[in-house]
């Protein structure tokens, strides 16, 4: 309640500032500023209103003025009547009129004012009206805020409720205010009744809301986020908090920025925990062996990027060796994952699985290397002879184990009698100690791909035993060779591919001749399957018998593989 300011004259003649509280028949009740005196009643003739705002006159010498000063230290300042004796610049020499003895003081213009033009108050200076308050509005009228609009409309300086008499007291300095109060009283009480009804409803609704909120907020989650991760937890423009509030069942989310603490309230525990997953950001360190760092990162960071994408972490950081924030062990590189609790858990599962896989693969490779090393040691100490099929054995069969009449064993033959272009039909390992198994295979394949006798006779020979185009040479012929006249014309019946056509005799023998240094050889190999017309190749035993028969015939001596 606003109070009307007045000036009250004391026993010393000075006027003190006070506030009017009530009006009586011949006095008013006032309270003093700063309560330096108790509340008491003052007669009308000792009360006056302050001068109007802006009232000020020029002060000259010998003018009566009022000085704002105090009589002693216990009393507040008040306005004393005085007279100006002298003016020196901004300073005024004044003489107090209320004192018996002459008392002068030098003051500044701020402590001076012209004499108050208001006269002492009378009974008609104040107006008071009382309005009976209905019983249902008594509680409502006890609130000063309920009469704010009514006070302004009436023009009164005070509207208060008397709880003892159940009346509404209206004080004013204008008689018009009393008339307006009587005119607006019914309307004011009616509006108060409507306001009271609405206020009661609002209070009831507020109570229900509070009870519902307390019931709905039975489940509460509280957690702290690191200060450097608060930006991630809040999100861009509070996106994460808004997303957490949209979770069904969440009633409120509060954030204490000073302590970085989140408070989540909800109707059930699941809703509160789900909202927490959106806001609880943390940092986790996973130790990775140094030898597996490259395989964990992958080419161009493909593998580590896949882990980040699938887990949902915000970022991953690989700490440097000289980073002192995280303790590092020898041979270990820390991988720091930043994100929500769930995303960090997912990243940990993915990375652990990949690390276990890499360790198992390295273990399998190590075992393979150990096995290979053992095999190399065993092979170096005792290497078994290579197993070769029968068709690669050639002349090492049991039928050829003996020596042909007039010839030497193949195992004892040297290479000194042969030219550089000589091709031997033997596949004996003892023929040349430096030959390898692959050399023998090539040699056998050469025998199988050698041209037939008829094919060979079509090529002309040179006198030194080498072939040349044009005419045939005069070298010796082996069995099954062409014995006709050299000058007799011969039809060219050989096929273009000499490898596909082999010359055979009537008994099924395969005629092959290799000439080098005027030497000839005859070799026969038994076919695996008989031909359609029943012809077959001779075995090694038949070949030996045939050679012996040839040696017994009178005529030129036959040279077999360079041996007479």
From Swiss-Prot:
Quote the cellular component terms of the Gene Ontology held in the record. axon; axon terminus; cell projection; chromocenter; chromosome; chromosome, centromeric region; cytoplasm; cytoplasmic ribonucleoprotein granule
Q: Which residues form the Agenet-like domain?
A: 4-50, 63-115
The free-text tissue note of the record is: During early to late tailbud stage, expression intensifies in the craniofacial region with prominent staining in the endodermal, mesodermal and mesenchymal regions of the pharyngeal arches. By early tadpole stage (stage 35), expressed in the forebrain, midbrain, hindbrain and notochord in addition to craniofacial regions including the ear vesicles and eye. In the central nervous system (CNS) of late tadpoles (stage 45), expressed in the olfactory bulbs and the cerebellum. In adults, expressed predominantly in the brain.
Q: Where does the record place Low complexity bias?
A: 426-435
List GO BP terms, alphabetically. Answer: animal organ development; DNA repair; glutamate receptor signaling pathway; membraneless organelle assembly; midbrain development; miRNA-mediated post-transcriptional gene silencing; mRNA export from nucleus; mRNA processing
| PANTHER family tied to this protein | FRAGILE X MENTAL RETARDATION SYNDROME-RELATED PROTEIN, FRAGILE X MESSENGER RIBONUCLEOPROTEIN 1
This protein's name: Fragile X messenger ribonucleoprotein 1 homolog A
Source organism:
Xenopus laevis (African clawed frog)
> Which gene is this protein's source?
fmr1-a
